[in-house]
Amino acid sequence: LIYVIIAYGITYVMGLLMWYGYGKGLDLSAFPNAQMLYPAAGVMMAYLITKKGDKNLPTAFYIFFVALTAVLVVCTAASVLAPQNRDLMSMPYSQWAPIMEYVIIGGSVIFWILLLQSGKEKRRSYGLNSEHWNISIRMILLFIGLYLLRFVIACALSGQLSEFGKIMANPTTWIIFFTVLVNFFLSVVAFFGEEYGWRYYLQPLLQKKFGLKGGVILLGCVWAVWHLPIDFFYYTTPDMGLAALASQFVTCISLGIFMAYTYMKTQNIWVPIIIHFLNNNMVVVFSGTYSADVLQNQQIHWGDIPVALVMNLLIFGWVIFLKPFKEKKA
């Protein structure tokens, strides 16, 4: 219950602020960044309350993460309620945006320190450990290969294969790609925030109740619904919001199946965290724009969804037929 109140309650209350900010033409880029921390903050808050006496609870690490989430919620609300907006190339640009960035970077540095300080025993007890790197690296490389395959097919279908070739041949692409990889360490709190909530906490719960396959598909659905406010007011415009939400179901179910597979196979939460990071950042690199603006105000039409569904299920969803999903119920 505590988890649901934080992961969903805060998301939808902030969604009302997004709606207000959208109507005022304000910069809403703070919202998706803060929202990514809510699922993990929900898990941690629940554990801090219900498992107080456990000596293996990484208390300092948890308290810091919950506090960091609270700071980001305040900054995000302030970006709409006390906007310090400037026009940057005719786009609204909030002076809260760099503040949020500094909080996330500073928070990520402290995150690593406290994580390492909590010790192996506590990390292992609460799913924070990193193990089986041999298979883990293979899973991450498999994801990169499948992601690029999907990109190539999408370019071929839209007749832009030569454009993709130019992007791949451009040295800037690779410089930015490796810069982005370094950036993982400075933005880890956001991707950890989602995956610790979805894959570590919710996935085993749903699989216990609805079976190995059913639990993962249901998780994809609840993950998609969680994106609702940013689908309507950030990724697209409200008139395309429903199409964006449908598209989100396609992504969250197909990618969710793949990420569930990697987590079940490796028992290493850092694998889905890294995959989530790559999924969100490779589009910035390989779209050739080299800017996160590519994520905002996208054009998503109903006609695009059947193709996306087939392509994503074929590229990422096939793993549901592999061995980890066939064993006895978790």
Please report, for each region that a protein language model flagged, where it lies by residue:
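Alpha-helical transmembrane segments in multi-pass membrane proteins
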Residues: 16-118, 137-141, 164-182, 302-311
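Membrane-interface capping segments at transmembrane-helix boundaries
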Residues: 48-55, 116-123, 317-330
